[in-house]
């Protein structure tokens, strides 16, 4: 029983180490400045700390958007929620073939600082849920929890 509690405690601790909600007052000025420079009219609904980086969640033109920003204020990637039908056809084909019975719950277009685009499809079946990552052409890259 003690081992189970230890495993659960470690799992929860590690999970929160990847992305932790923080108050705006905990966000360094350089990070906030970098965000405001790129999105001067946006209002951040939530800040998270992801390792050494920060994530700002906000709505842009009524669309859920988030950006990952480094400690110096440079935007590393932008994630924009898209309609499932906006995923490349190859993504839908891959999911139908390899994950029959699963439903795409959410879709995201991710653009890194170099302009490289990837897509993330959050799929679920019952209580099972995970993300599938694809390149800009819809070719499968990896499965993420």
For each predicted feature, which ranges?
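Mature soluble domains of exported/periplasmic/lumenal proteins and thiol-rich metal-chelating peptides
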Residues: 20-145
């Amino acid at each position: 029983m003690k081992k189970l509690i230890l495993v659960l405690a470690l799992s929860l601790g590690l999970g929160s180490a990847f992305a932790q909600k923080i108050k705006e007052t905990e966000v360094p000025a350089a990070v906030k400045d970098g965000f405001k420079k790129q999105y001067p009219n946006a209002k951040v609904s939530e800040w998270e700390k992801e390792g050494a980086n920060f994530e700002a969640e906000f709505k842009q033109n009524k669309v859920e958007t988030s950006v990952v920003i480094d400690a110096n204020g440079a935007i590393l990637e932008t994630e924009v929620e898209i309609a499932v039908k906006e995923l490349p056809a190859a993504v839908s084909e891959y999911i139908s073939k390899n994950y029959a019975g699963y439903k795409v719950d959410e879709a995201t277009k991710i653009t890194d600082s170099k302009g490289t685009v990837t897509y993330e499809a959050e799929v679920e079946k019952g209580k099972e849920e995970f993300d599938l990552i694809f390149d800009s052409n819809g070719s499968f890259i990896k499965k993420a929890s």
